[in-house]
């Protein structure tokens, strides 16, 4: 009987496409793993249980267990169980990187309201500061018109008055910008944001309620189908598909709501950014225009020449000294004059000469920019200038170069010190010169005595 079955399978015209059954040592039929069909797995034990000889029930059960163990060990059986073919291609909340919740929307509204209050307060303060600046400028103008004020002082006071008028005008402009861009327009943006938020929430609640009701009806329908004694697999599958579709619609609704909330917050922030950028540009341009007034030729050159450096780190006092006393500043120069006596050449070598300024249009420095500035120093400088003028401009220097350290150029650079080697060499030269002078004086004295004799 096994031979006949084998011959019948081999003799069939479509034997290559059918399940191949082989005889295994005369004990049982074996299924080739290459031709295993997972959807026919429940029929393989029935086919393999056919035996040509009569056998006991115990041997049939053992053969059935051997066949199942063989199928479980095969690679084809490990791939028999597949995942569900029902897949959802809709967007979910997990796809979003950022979720804008109700709390985030509330924080956005509070931040916008805080910006509105602060911008209004800053605009009011700028307006008040502008008015005070205009009053200061008017006061300076009145002082310049006094009879006892000379022309030079009046001109400088009027320059300062014009500067404060300019500051007042620019502060008034900034106050207007803050009031318009971050005041009225920001109120409109806040109102629009709140309105769009309420519309989106109401729409989401209505659609979510509708989808939830449809989902409950579908669940009830599936429960009724499950109670039937005779189940139709096709209708049961269709009901499950409908339930999955309802769930997908509800998930898509949530995804769209959070996505719209994120876009609303982003658009509102971009609107605020454009307004802040405009205000920032206006502030930068106004500051640059004010800074140009301090450049050379800006109209404040003569006024700044009389000003002290308020940001100097070398001096803390009002007169460019540590304690604010003008007398202490000249101690170094007085000590130099005492050690040098009346020798002008020694003082010039010790103090050095400053480099002449070739540019007449550069920004003048304030008085506080120099290291020290004392009346004694100015007096010694004037004495040195007198010696230079009497010398007739030696070493190829003209009068402009000689007057660099005069009173008219009090803002020039401080004198530089020579090195120790140069000072030592100078002392040697001076000592040789003094010895020669003493020797010549002794010779003259001896000649006088001889003439008297």
UniProtKB/Swiss-Prot annotation:
Q: Which gene encodes it?
A: IVY1
State whether it acts alone or in a complex, and with which partners, per the record. Answer: Homomultimer. Interacts with YPT7 and VPS33.
Q: Which organism is it from?
A: Saccharomyces cerevisiae (strain ATCC 204508 / S288c) (Baker's yeast)
- Give an example GO cellular component term for this record: membrane raft
Please state what the protein is called: Protein IVY1
InterPro entries assigned = AH/BAR_dom_sf (IPR027267), IVY1 (IPR037470)
Q: How does it sit in the membrane?
A: Peripheral membrane protein
User: Which keywords does this chain's UniProt record carry?
Assistant: Coiled coil, Membrane, Phosphoprotein, Vacuole
Which Gene3D superfamilies does the record cross-reference, listed alphabetically? Answer: Arfaptin homology (AH) domain/BAR domain
Its Gene Ontology biological processes? vacuole fusion, non-autophagic
- Coiled coil location: 102-122, 230-257
């Amino acid at each position: 009987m096994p031979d006949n079955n084998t011959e019948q399978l081999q003799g069939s015209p479509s034997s290559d496409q059918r399940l191949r059954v082989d005889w295994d040592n005369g004990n049982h039929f074996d299924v080739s793993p290459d031709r295993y069909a997972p959807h026919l797995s429940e029929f393989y034990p029935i086919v393999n249980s056919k035996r040509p000889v009569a056998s006991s029930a115990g041997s049939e059960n053992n053969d059935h267990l051997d066949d199942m163990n063989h199928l479980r060990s095969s690679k084809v059986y490990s791939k028999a169980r597949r995942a569900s073919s029902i897949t959802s291609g809709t967007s979910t909340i997990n796809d979003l990187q950022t979720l804008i919740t109700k709390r985030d929307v509330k924080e956005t509204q509070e931040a916008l309201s805080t910006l509105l209050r602060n911008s209004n307060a800053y605009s009011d303060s700028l307006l008040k500061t502008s008015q005070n600046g205009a009053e200061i400028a008017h006061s300076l103008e009145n002082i310049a018109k006094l009879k006892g004020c000379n022309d030079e002082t009046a001109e400088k006071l009027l320059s300062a008055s014009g500067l404060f008028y300019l500051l007042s005008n620019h502060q008034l402009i900034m106050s207007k910008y803050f009031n318009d861009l971050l005041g009225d327009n920001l109120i409109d943006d806040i109102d629009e944001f709140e309105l769009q938020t309420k519309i989106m929430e109401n729409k989401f609640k209505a659609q979510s309620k509708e989808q939830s009701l449809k989902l409950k009806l579908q669940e009830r329908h599936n429960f009724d189908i499950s109670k039937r004694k005779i189940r139709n697999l096709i209708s049961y599958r269709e009901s499950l598909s409908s339930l999955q579709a309802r769930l997908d619609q509800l998930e898509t609704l949530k995804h769209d709501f959070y996505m719209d909330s994120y876009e609303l917050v982003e658009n509102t922030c971009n609107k605020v950014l454009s307004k802040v950028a405009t205000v920032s540009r206006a502030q930068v341009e106004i500051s640059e225009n004010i800074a140009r007034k301090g450049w050379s030729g800006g109209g404040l050159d003569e006024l700044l020449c009389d000003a002290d450096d308020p940001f100097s780190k070398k001096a803390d006092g009002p007169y460019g000294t540590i304690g604010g006393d003008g007398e202490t500043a000249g101690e170094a120069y007085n000590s130099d004059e005492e050690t040098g006596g009346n020798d002008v050449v020694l003082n010039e070598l010790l103090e050095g000469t400053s480099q002449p300024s070739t540019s007449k249009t550069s920004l003048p420095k304030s008085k506080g920019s120099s290291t020290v500035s004392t009346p004694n120093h100015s007096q010694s400088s004037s004495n040195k200038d007198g010696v230079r003028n009497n010398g007739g401009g030696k070493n190829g220097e003209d009068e402009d170069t000689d007057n660099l350290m005069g009173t008219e150029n009090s803002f020039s650079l401080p004198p530089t010190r020579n090195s120790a080697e140069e000072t030592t060499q100078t002392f040697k030269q001076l000592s040789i010169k003094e010895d020669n002078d003493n020797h010549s004086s002794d010779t003259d004295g001896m000649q006088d005595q001889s003439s008297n004799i």
